[in-house]
Structure formats: structure tokens, C-alpha cells
């Protein structure tokens, strides 16, 4: 009964938000930030670890970059070594040029592949097909596409239970090769992703065998066509 009540409340909230979004209602107004701690100093990769051939700091931002002649064998990550947060809010600004990237959270590091991760990801790509969705790297794949509020039951596949907005309308909020504000909220079995002040995807994950309720944070360099991911103003609030 508690689960049904919780799910019903979130579905109702998502439906109301989708209606406001469809009518071009106001974005969620910014509020004063309290309780956030920076996890990137803007000057160095102190506290982070990854393959140095792909990662550097430039103009106050973490930069991960590949080229046609400089490719990882598999997707590789810059991993924050400051802990494995459970319930938290994560805020940062990102800029993506080229192929594909993502922000990992509640993830694990694979023991047999250096700097490889498995877990939840705030996905992003240069063509904006996937930006704003919740994905699981090396796991269950697409969990909540942009515009979706999805639910995963025990041993089940993701099911769309409501909408948080039209995917194409939300796509218009993405700034392409410019700075975007990402806000992730992870609390218990619930994950909310926001881009530039709008909710873009929501997930309730009750698949106890597949989900993780705590884990590492990381930034992805994706194998394949050349890409460049930049991230700055990275801050974390534990809930």
C-alpha cells in the first residue's frame, strides 16, 4: 500500500508537470543552494582518477577528449574518489561536442577493466537523441527516455507510467555545444534528472537485483567518433 501511494503521488506530480510543460509553463525557479560541497577544485584532477591520455583541466573545467587517432579500447571514465554517495543531489554544468558522453552515479568500477564503470548514467549525445534520459551503463540499458516517468518492478523491464513532458519540446531546452545545467536527485528507489531547470526524466527502480542504492560518480569518454566533454562547477549534497 505504501508503494502504491508513493507511486500514485509521483505519477500525479509528473502528470501535472507535463501539463505545465506542454503549455510552456514556468521552469522550476532556482532556489538558494545550501549544503552543497564542491567535488572539483577547478584547477586540477585532485580527487579524481582516470586514464591521463584522455583527461585534463582547461579553463576551469574537466575536459575528456578523444580523436580519430586517440581512442579508448572501451568506454573509459574519470572517477571521483571521494566516496560512494547513496542519497544525494548532484549539480554541474556540462558542454558536449561530438559523439556521446554521460555522468555516472551509483555505479561500480569493474575489477577487470581499468577505469570502466557499470551503473546509472545521465546520458548525453551530440545529436540530442539521448540527452536527458536515464541509462544504465553495462547493465539494463535504457531505463527512462527523455520525457518519461518510468517504473521498474522486481525482475521486470522498465514500464512507462507517465510523462514529464514531450521529448521534442524538452530537446529544445538543450543548448548543444554550450553550457547546460544538470541536476540529479537520487533518493531511495527514486531518481530525477533535470536539465536547464526542467525535469527531463524520472525513474522509480524496485528491481532489487538490478539497482544500486549507492555508488561511485564518474564522467564518461565514449569510444567511437571523436568527442569532447567538459564539466565544471561540480557540487554534491548528501541527503
What are these regions (language model features)?
Residues 1-7:
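Bacterial N-terminal signal peptides that target proteins for export
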Residues 10-19:
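Hydrophobic h-region of N-terminal signal peptides that target proteins for export
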Residues 19-239:
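Carbohydrate-interacting regions of secretory-pathway proteins
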Residues 7-9, 109:
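Sequence-pattern detector for short linear motifs
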Residues 6, 13, 157-158:
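Low-complexity, intrinsically disordered short peptide segments enriched in small/polar/basic residues
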Amino acid at each position: 500500500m505504501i508503494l502504491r501511494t508513493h507511486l500514485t503521488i509521483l505519477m500525479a506530480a509528473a502528470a501535472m508537470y507535463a501539463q505545465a510543460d506542454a503549455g510552456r509553463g514556468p521552469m522550476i525557479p532556482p532556489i538558494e543552494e545550501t549544503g552543497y560541497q564542491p567535488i572539483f577544485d577547478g584547477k586540477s584532477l585532485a580527487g579524481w582518477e582516470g586514464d591521463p591520455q584522455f583527461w585534463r583541466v582547461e579553463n576551469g573545467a574537466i575536459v575528456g577528449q578523444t580523436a580519430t587517432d586517440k581512442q579508448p579500447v572501451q568506454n573509459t571514465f574519470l572517477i571521483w574518489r571521494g566516496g560512494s554517495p547513496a542519497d544525494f543531489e548532484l549539480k554541474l554544468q556540462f558542454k558536449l561536442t561530438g559523439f556521446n558522453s554521460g555522468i555516472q552515479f551509483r555505479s561500480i568500477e569493474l575489477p577487470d577493466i581499468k577505469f570502466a564503470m557499470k551503473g546509472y548514467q545521465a546520458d548525453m549525445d551530440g545529436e540530442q537523441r539521448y540527452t536527458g534520459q536515464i541509462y544504465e551503463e553495462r547493465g539494463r540499458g535504457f531505463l527512462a527516455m527523455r520525457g518519461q516517468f518510468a517504473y521498474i518492478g522486481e525482475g521486470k523491464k522498465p514500464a512507462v507510467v507517465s510523462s514529464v513532458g514531450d521529448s521534442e519540446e524538452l530537446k529544445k531546452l538543450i543548448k548543444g555545444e554550450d553550457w547546460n545545467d544538470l541536476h540529479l536527485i537520487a533518493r531511495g528507489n527514486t531518481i530525477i534528472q533535470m536539465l536547464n531547470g526542467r525535469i527531463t526524466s524520472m525513474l522509480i527502480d524496485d528491481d532489487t537485483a538490478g539497482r544500486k542504492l549507492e555508488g561511485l560518480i564518474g564522467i564518461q569518454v565514449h569510444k567511437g567518433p571523436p568527442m569532447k566533454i567538459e564539466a565544471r562547477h561540480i557540487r554534491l549534497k548528501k541527503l
